[in-house]
């Protein structure tokens, strides 16, 4: 299978490392021509994960997304969700026909409130059975250091999903298979919002006791949203009860791709969403925090998208709702979190 990686940030670089560590040649779209020249000459990405050295014979680098798409059978999408439309906008309607797409995007398209598969279906008539996601608690920095990590691959067909996942399995990366394509994407979006909230709490100097209660309630709020949006009876986790009448298993969100990713994004110092939230809690304006971070915190745009979606589905979301108000409606972080406190259990 010919792989193409779309994106050149930390996560795209980590995924390129995983594939090439398995001896897989890749086509790699990188927007910046100077970064391409640097990788060819110095064997590493000058901006992201510079400790990762690549075997350049396995890299076909290009700043043309059309060329990378045309040369690939399976495309790994790893650009921030806000840039998807601009990145893929130059492609023809049939450019993705017969190809597989693996989404590594833990975000939602702003203004459109679409998951990547929904966008691809609308713009390219992309087939749902050819769409996969790769999610889970896996920071790019730890992949670069080859610390043992777990990634969950989701797709409609288990056999095909296992085949795609097999290209990513290494001695430092275990793969998990899951059929919940929509649920894992929404969970990844929500955990970025909640991690931003955890950062705000840290910036406001709440302690570990409060933070643990906040995150536990975030997990419950996430589960409620997933059920409201229609994600039901998914088979994840190891402790599941089967309804004796319907024989359907109850939803269990204690698997690594849901709860695990929430925990690591809320607690880890690698988390850009937590870092962004920490600055907001300390009194930074959104604009100043964005300039200081100099990377995309997906939770910022996601908070508005989820707010708009929740107007329709009406899930109980006091935590995500307040994070939205702090970021978008100029509610002060301190008084805002005081309003959250009574909801926590």
Question: For the regions a protein language model found, what residue spans apply to each?
Answer:
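NAD(P)+-binding Rossmann beta1-loop-alpha1 motif at the extreme N-terminus of oxidoreductases
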Residues: 1-52, 58-63
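Conserved active-site and cofactor/substrate-binding residues in soluble primary-metabolism enzymes
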Residues: 6, 10, 14, 34, ...
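Internal alpha-helical scaffold of NAD(P)-dependent oxidoreductase catalytic cores
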Residues: 83, 94, 123-129, 148-251
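NAD(P)-dependent Rossmann-like dehydrogenase/reductase catalytic/cofactor-binding core
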Residues: 191, 198-202, 206, 227-345
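Rossmann-like NAD(P)(H) cofactor-binding subdomain of soluble oxidoreductases
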Residues: 61-70, 74-148, 164-166
